[in-house]
Amino acid sequence: MGRQRLPVIVGFGGVNAAGRSSGHHAYTRMTWSAQSGAQRNRTLAALTTMMGLEPGNPHEQYILDHTLIRRIEASHFDVDAVDWNQRLPMQNDDQPVHFDLERRHLPDVIPPHWVVTDNSVTHVSVQITGQQAFLLPTKRAFEVKSAGQLPTGFEPGKLYPSRNHPRGLQMTVYAASDALGSLGLDWEDVTRRVAVDQISVYAGSAMGQLDSAGAGGMLKSRYNGQRVTSKYCPLSFAEMPADFINAYVLGSLGSTGASLGACASFLYNLRNGIDDIRSGRARVAFVGAAEAPITPEIMEGYSAMGALATEKGLRQLDGLSDEQAPDFRRA
């Protein structure tokens, strides 16, 4: 039986609601009460830097309150005033609706029950009879108000030329850099010994990039009266985290892609990397996954499945009245 190469994990990194993965800082934050004072201090120092806080000042309680699962912060969206379009049906047979508007705002296809009259070169008068449905931009309170968010104040897109990249890809670049930093070697030392086509990258996003800089913007721009840009579609691809690791961090030429399987996406990518090393297709494998699903649209989808704790549900679990605030940390 021939010898088989043994894959060895030589570094890891990332970022999540508990902070940086490297140095076991995220693990320390999640197991805070069980950690020694020395390990807590190291993690506090790391989070102080991440969150842009002034070193040397006591920030422990602030850091604890602004990491892990908590009330969704305004940097994502206002949970008390989420934008949406309310359907507004109107029926006007006896008293037609009249309004004036600029000619350039007329729809390309005039509805059959509209009567358009010229007022001037630039403006027209519109009369509507019969039934007409409008979409009224308004606000509403979001049912789900808690999520695991990156530490308050940490914005990965500010650490490199992000150029309006979706948040998941910003996190990917930071996470890959964090993993390389934990390696203990300069990446140039590795590439001097390993050919660029012997380095494989497997990383993806099961949901894709669905915020406003990716597929989210592509899908809702026209409905909001905006234009679709050329970046929305390509930046939303599910395998784009692997492409970004290559483009911004590694510059390798080996196998690149992603296997997707909901919560198991990372494990599938890990298997791909292990198979590459065992088979000899690669000497180095870089694997990961990135998800940034804190948007009203995605969270509403999961909430409809019953997969997220609503504010009302938390109150019912704790026996609270409508006036009492639930403990969002327990969501």
Place the predicted regions along the sequence by residue:
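Conserved "HGTGT" condensation-loop signature of ketosynthase/thiolase-family condensing enzymes
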Residues: 1-254, 275, 290, 294, ...
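Short glycine- and Lys/Arg-enriched binding-loop motifs that mark or flank ligand-binding interfaces
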Residues: 200, 262, 285
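Short pre-catalytic strand/loop immediately N-terminal to key active-site residues, enriched for Gly-Thr
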Residues: 254-261
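Short conserved active-site loop signatures built around small residues
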Residues: 266
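Active-site histidine-anchored catalytic micro-motif
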Residues: 269
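Short, high-confidence coil segments that cap the C-terminus of an alpha-helix
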Residues: 279-285
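A short secondary-structure junction signal
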Residues: 297-300
